Amino acid sequence: MNMRPPKPVALAALIGFALGAPLAASAQVVPLKEAKLNIEHNATVNDTGYQGAIDSEGWGGLTVTGPDGVILELKPQGKLATLGMTELFFETVEPENAKVPVADMLAILPEGKYKIEGPVVASLGGGTTAGTAWLTHNIPAGAVLITPAEGAKVPLGDTVMSWGAVTQTITGKPVKIIAYELIIEKVGDPDPNMIGKPNSLSMHVRPSVNEITISAAFFEAGSPYAWEILAVEESGNQTLASGKFSTE
């Protein structure tokens, strides 16, 4: 007959079962809804930086760890910290390639998996929230903007926005584009209170789409507009090309 005492884990499980205690609740691991780390390159002004996007039910702090160790720590403080944070989007400074070459920017973070994890706020049961971001150094080339032509004055009406397909990286290697993002904004000061820009639109389209017509209802007569096409490759890295036009 085995008379040795139960191992600590087994003993804890027995006590938890006897008392009806939900021991697993304190050790819950809640997957992040979103865990992304990408590169954004601007092919028009030639600068490059990193971006991240995180979404969860609620976290009290986060640590981002990659192949070379910790690259970022986030810790909310103050009155709102007790509520916990959910969504977060961040961008690094994007130095000009002439000052910091792309190769030097890529050397900051190696390719690979980046673990994003931290505590779940107590009000949501505690535990840990975690996810993994995938970073590559595949940077798409910029799309060629076709219409409207740069600096064109277009009639007020339905307007065709078109661009060339992107098939290579900035180093000439084949690239898999998974989407294009079209952004159009009326040039002007941002609203002092509204999050987001008034008189603007943003949409993602399939990689097979290189042309879309925007309704005349979006545009105002005699107004300047800026537009961008972002080519997004399969790991999430994106390159933007931008232009300007105006309406009659």
Which sequence ranges carry the predicted segments?
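Bacterial N-terminal signal peptides
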Residues: 12-21
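Structural beta-strand segments of beta-rich domains
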Residues: 44-50, 157-161
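Recognizes extended acidic, P/S/T-rich segments that occur
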Residues: 69-100, 177-220, 234
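Surface-exposed, short loops/turns at beta-strand junctions within beta-sandwich domains
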Residues: 105-111, 217-223
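Conserved structural position at the C-terminal beta-strand
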Residues: 118-120, 229-231
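Extracellular fibronectin type III
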Residues: 127-129, 232-248
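Proline/serine/threonine-rich low-complexity linkers at boundaries of modular beta-sandwich domains
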Residues: 130-144
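Conserved aromatic anchor
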Residues: 154-174
